[in-house]
Each structure stands twice: as C-alpha cells, then as structure tokens.
Amino acid sequence: MRVTLKSDNIFKTVCLACGAAVLILTAGFFIQLLWASSEAWSRFGLELLVSSDWDPGNEKFGALPSIVGTSVTTVIALLIALPLAFAASLFIVDAPKKVGMILGYAVDLLAAIPSVIYGMWGLFVLAPLMQKYIQPFMVNTLQMDKIPFVNSNYNGFGLFTAGVILAVMILPYICAVLRDVLQMTPPVLKEAAYGIGCTKLEANKDIILRYGIRGVLGGIFIGLGRALGETMAVLFVIGNMMNMPKGIFDSATTISSTLANNFAEADGLQRSVLFALGVILLLMCLGIQITSQSFLHVTKAKRGEK
C-alpha cells in the first residue's frame, strides 16, 4: 500500500512538472519575442498592424501585407481541403476493408512528405499548370474575375497557388480526424437514418457529422493551425512580394515567408520588426486554439454534455 501510494505521488509530480514545463516554455517563447520586438513596438505601436509600407532603407515597416497573405492563403486552403477531406473520409470508411486501408495509408503518407518537397513540386509542376491551364480557365471560361478579390492578371504564382499547396498539406490531418469521427459513430444511428429513408449523403451530413461535430471542429482547427505556420512550401510559390494583394492571383507574402526571406541579413530595427511579426503569428495561433476550445465548449453545452 505504501509502495503504491509513493509511486502515485511520484507519477503525479512528474505529470505536474511536465504540464508546468509546457506552460513555462510557451510563456518563455512569448516573453522572448516581446522583448526582442520591443524596439519595433515602441517605434511604430499598433500602426505596425495596419501599415503596408516595407522599406528597410528608410526604416518604414508594416505588417499588414504579411497578415493579409497569411489569412487569405489559410482560408483558401481550408475551402479546398475541407470538402476533399470529407469526401475522402466517407469513401475510405464505406469502401471494402482492404481498399479503405490502402487508401487510408496513401492519404496518411501525404503528411510524411517534407514541406520542401511540396514547395519544389509547386514551383516546377503546380505553378506552370496554374499559369497555362487552371488560372486561364478560371478567368476566361468561368469568368471568375467578376468575383471580388479575383483578378484577371496571373503568372502562376501568388496567394491561390500557395493556398492549393497548403490544402494538399493539411488534407491528411483533417482527413484522419474525420475518419475517426465516422468510424466511431454508433452503427445504430446510420441504420436509423437509412430506415427513415435518408440517402447516404443526408445520413452523413445531417446525422453523423452532427453527432461527431466536436471531432470535426477539432480536425478543422488542427488544419488551420498547420496552415498558419507553414513556411517552406509557401515560400516557393507565393511570389514573395511585400505589397498589399488586390486579388488571389497576385504575388504576395505571409508572416512565415517574410521571416524566412529577411531574417538572415536583418539587423537593428528591421530585426526587431521581424520579431514583432513572430509575436503576431504566435498570437494568431493562440487565438485559433482559444477559439477552437470555445467552439467545443459551446457545442458541448448545446448537446447537454458535462
């Protein structure tokens, strides 16, 4: 009994220390970034968030193009990846066991591909395809340039191409969560839905997804967090222009690609501004996590769970 009690206390202490270490590391990252970016915040204040200037020679800096680029590419990635992940998950779960297993492994392998490989594929394969076929089809045939924020000028690079790359990269993460949600749904729910005449689409959309909405939201926010911080793949295809984009086909930049492009030779005020961009990115990621937990809490309360 004494040995068991002692081991429980040791285990509790170790777990507490690990949990505290996570909090200390997170706080340490944030404090270090704030301290390193203090010169930028004292010089520009909140104006840094709304300025689009970027002229290191005259010490004019603005984070708005990077923030907009990060947000737009992430939204494009989610809009593309979510329906694909949902359709792939449904097919994998409903397919014969061996077929579903092979397809599941194939989707999971996408997560194992290094981001630099995605970037090279985007540079040498996707960007030329975008310039020659996809973007002309979207503009000339579908006439999508009439939609706000879809411009008629394109060169294969830009926000849309970066969003497509990110969609492929976050697809396996969202798909894995959705597969688990679909597989954990009690069979009686499906049988009841089919029994009252629901189609397969209606059963999955109105019954199963609602039952596993917490898992679905978790998968969405996992993909969102993954897309926000991606650097190398985006760096290859976004165009790396420190200008405010006028459309999704414009070359632009993201926070992470701005850091990768400028940090090596930056010093003085520019280095402090780059640390400030790191603070902004960290706050965006923390905001996503807080929002996801809030959504899950609200959903849990609506379902009457404790």
Regions found by a protein language model. Give the residues of each.
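Interhelical loop and adjacent transmembrane-helix boundary motif
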Residues: V234-L282
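Membrane-cytosol interface at the C-terminal ends of specific transmembrane alpha-helices
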Residues: F86-F91, L142-G195, T199, I207, ...
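C-terminal transmembrane helix and the adjacent membrane-cytosol boundary/short C-terminal tail
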Residues: R179-Q183, P187, N261-K306
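Transmembrane alpha-helices
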Residues: L109, I113, I117, I174-L178, ...
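Membrane-interfacial helix termini and adjacent extracytoplasmic/periplasmic loops
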Residues: S42-F61, Y118-V168
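Transmembrane alpha-helix signature in integral membrane proteins
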Residues: F61-F91, I220
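Transmembrane-helix boundary motif in ABC transporter permease subunits
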Residues: V3, A77-V107, S292-V298
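Cytoplasmic-entry segments and transmembrane alpha-helices of multi-pass inner-membrane transporters
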Residues: K12, A87-G122, G304-K306
